[in-house]
């Protein structure tokens, strides 16, 4: 329930900013007045939600796991930080809003928008022409920019950072578009192709931005800069020199190993980690080291018995009957090291040093 309220709060403040701070004119084809905002509000809310869900997926096994408070931290000016996690959150939120608006446009949810057929009939490359129904990312980009960027009314370095990362998110959607083609020719031959652009799965956008997160650029500017024309010029010059495909941040990240109630950080104590599994990636297999060991915590193995339906059979007519199977599941958690473990480790290190001397 909390998340839904936060998402609709996000959509509300986007619309409020649109009504109070920005002229609502997009290529002279949008309606004006409250009805115009309501048309897109559900898509904005859904897009913000998809951004949050993707953020939580991408950071599920990181020390920072995109907590529910991330949206609040992003939209409340008094609480916002300017680290690389904030950069990712702005980008994925912006991407989510643009992606959803674009998809809903193609689905026919808006009267003033449809397929992008502006290049249809033009030669795209060797043996293929533009055609079909391309997803209208241009529409999604323009509308999402009007909504999302309206949140940043300041002219300081942090506002510039957020606007930059919003743009990175929109570029990510455009950059991951996929070309789909259909063959034309006699008897199934492919003498020529008609091609169009489609949105990828949103997971592709998330994966793309997670890579950008790892390579985010730190900008050395004072957060309070922007009180004079000279400082605003310096900020603009700095950000204009950085590619709109690279995430930027102003601050180093806090220590996510430790609990910090002021920042709403729970720390990693009590977190579940992964050790074994056929389908685990290398990153996932290292979670116990990353979340526990590297944070000075021990790994505790816990076993629990679960009950689930199994051996299901269809019986005529028309029921499915299942057995209830019990299974022991092993899970791993980060816990504080006991004094005994600490003393044992200290003794081993001392013994090792003595052996080296001899």
Curated annotation (Swiss-Prot):
Alphabetic keyword roster: Developmental protein, Disulfide bond, Extracellular matrix, Glycoprotein, Lipoprotein, Secreted, Signal, Wnt signaling pathway
Annotated glycosylation sites: 104, 260, 279, 345
GO molecular function: cytokine activity; frizzled binding
GO terms for biological process, alphabetical: canonical Wnt signaling pathway; cell fate commitment; commissural neuron axon guidance; embryonic pattern specification; eye development; eye field cell fate commitment involved in camera-type eye formation; forebrain development; forebrain neuron differentiation
Post-translational modification: Palmitoleoylation is required for efficient binding to frizzled receptors. Depalmitoleoylation leads to Wnt signaling pathway inhibition. Proteolytic processing by tiki1 and tiki2 promotes oxidation and formation of large disulfide-bond oligomers, leading to inactivation of wnt8b.
O-palmitoleoyl serine: lipidated positions: 187
Tree of life domain: Eukaryota
Disulphide bonds in the chain: 55-66, 105-113, 115-133, 181-195, 183-190, 257-295, 273-288, 292-334, 310-325, 312-322, 317-318
Expressed in which tissues: Hindbrain r1, 2 and 5.
GO cellular component, one term: extracellular space
Family of this protein: Belongs to the Wnt family.
Role of this protein: Ligand for fzd8a, a member of the G-protein coupled frizzled receptor family. May play a role in the establishment of polarity in the nervous system. Involved in canonical Wnt signaling pathway. During embryonic development, required for the acquisition of caudal diencephalic fate. Antagonizes eye specification.
Protein's recorded name: Protein Wnt-8b
Species this chain originates from: Danio rerio
């Amino acid at each position: 329930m909390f998340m839904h309220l936060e998402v609709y709060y996000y959509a509300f403040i986007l619309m409020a900013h649109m009504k109070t701070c920005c002229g609502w004119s997009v290529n002279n084809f949008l309606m004006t007045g409250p009805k115009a905002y309501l048309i897109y509000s559900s898509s904005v809310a859904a897009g913000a939600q998809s951004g949050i869900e993707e953020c939580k997926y991408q950071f599920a096994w990181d020390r920072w796991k995109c907590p529910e408070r991330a949206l609040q931290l992003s939209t409340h000016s008094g609480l916002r930080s300017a680290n690389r996690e904030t950069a990712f959150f702005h980008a994925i939120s912006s991407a989510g809003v643009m992606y959803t608006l674009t998809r809903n446009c193609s689905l026919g949810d808006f009267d003033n928008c449809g397929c992008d057929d502006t290049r249809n009939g033009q030669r795209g490359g060797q043996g293929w022409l533009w055609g079909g129904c391309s997803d209208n990312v241009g529409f999604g980009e323009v509308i999402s920019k009007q909504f999302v960027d309206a949140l940043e009314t300041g002219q300081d370095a942090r506002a510039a950072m957020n606007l930059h990362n919003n743009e990175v998110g929109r570029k990510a959607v455009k950059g991951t578009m996929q070309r789909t083609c259909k063959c034309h020719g006699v008897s199934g031959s492919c003498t020529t192709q008609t091609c169009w652009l489609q949105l990828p799965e949103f997971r592709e956008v998330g994966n793309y931005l997670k890579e950008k997160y790892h390579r985010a650029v730190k900008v050395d500017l004072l957060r309070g800069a922007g009180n004079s024309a000279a400082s605003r010029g310096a900020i603009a010059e700095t950000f204009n020199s950085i590619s709109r495909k690279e995430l930027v941040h102003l601050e180093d990240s806090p220590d996510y190993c430790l609990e910090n109630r002021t920042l709403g950080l729970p720390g990693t104590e009590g977190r579940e980690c992964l050790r074994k599994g056929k389908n685990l990636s290398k990153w996932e297999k290292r979670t116990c080291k990353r979340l526990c060991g590297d944070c000075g915590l021990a790994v505790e193995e816990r076993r629990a018995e679960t009950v689930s339906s199994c051996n299901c059979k269809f019986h005529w007519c028309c029921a499915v009957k299942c057995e209830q199977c019990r299974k022991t599941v092993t899970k791993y958690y980060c816990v504080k090291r006991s004094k005994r473990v600490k003393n044992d480790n200290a003794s081993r290190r001392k013994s090792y040093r003595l052996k080296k001397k001899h």
